[in-house]
Amino acid sequence: QKIIKDLKSNGANIYFIPGGGSNEIGALGYVECLNEIIKENKKYNFTQIIHGTGSSGTQAGLLAGKKYFNCNIPVTGISVRFDKQTQEDKVYQCAKKTCELLKCNILEKSEVTAYDEYIGPGYGMPSEEMLEATKLLAKKEAILLDPVYSGKGFAGLIGMIKNKQFTKSDNVLFIHTGGAVSLSAYEWAFKK
């Protein structure tokens, strides 16, 4: 922040991109993602959207998109970094700014849902649930999850299924946010 302030004071035109691109501009990508989901929903009738949430941009964009497109599909984030309250606060603040940018209705804080049961030992640190989820999806579907976001998000989805949070008639969409390239950095964790 000091460097940015110094550069601006010297006349530089600076645009700071936060970690994960998680601000109202970055969240617009997931507003558009929700637009695509709505189009596909005519065919699939999704009853829930689940994804890993950390820096907040993905979930904020999806939630702002719900307001912008008047969509009622529930969105649940599986926190990979912060406790439930902190994560929900971060998502709400980013989603609120995104709604303001879109000039649409502002969501209520109660519309933000994040679970924190699948963080494990910490951000970027493997958990047993993540390892099991990542191995399962690779083995059954040949889909690679990253250990930091999607792996923990998918572990959360499996946990929700085990906890009977869905019915047989539910059609749940899991959003894989990428990052599988980081798997090689976690080779040691999968050898246990």
Where in this protein do the model-derived segments appear?
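Short glycine-centered, acidic/aromatic-flanked micro-motifs in structured strand/loop junctions
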Residues: 19, 80, 116, 147, ...
